[in-house]
Amino acid sequence: IRDDLVTGVQTCALPICDDLQSLNERVIPTLLGRIRPEARRLLDIHRHANRSTFIVSAAPQEIVEPLALSLGMTGAIGTRGEVHDGVYTGELEGPFCYGEGKVEAIEQLARWDNLDLAQCYAYSDSSSDLPMLSAVGHPVVVNPDGRLERHARRNGWPIVHFRQRSRTVIRRVLAGVATTAVAAGAFVVGMSVG
């Protein structure tokens, strides 16, 4: 996956604003309509506990940030493409936000905001997020894949199953934007503030 996304960024020299704004105008309302009520309730719980909440995703920052803000979240941590004079250069700026890259990204955020990751929450449905889940004090798996569910059971992590929509449907609908994060309650990190 990393190689495919990096190749996509490296072969892209496109103006950023118009194309992404147009894409976001089409995609975000659709995504918002597909977010599970349980995921919204989890976000509300963290908000009422005065915690900052972030989507942490391999998707481009320019897509996950507006989605997070539309959900009333603090922000998003996504993969950032380097931009020069309003055009993508084809290089990454910062870590590829996948696997260990997510750990690097949340550790950086924790340093900036003086947060203790042992007091933070992370939610995921994918075993690819085991590094991120292992880096926080409160990992929660949501509609997990088989490997993640086995790991969670062995380690005593909470397992949450959302009803109605299956993981397969969520992944198919959101795969193009890599935001299963919010729809399945995954890749959301709730961080204690103050």
Each predicted region: which residue ranges?
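Single conserved hydrophobic/aromatic residue that forms the stacking wall/gate
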Residues: 1-12
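Membrane-proximal helical "anchor" segments flanking the first transmembrane region
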Residues: 11-19, 175
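C-terminal cap/substrate-recognition subdomain and adjoining C-terminal extension
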Residues: 21-23, 29-194
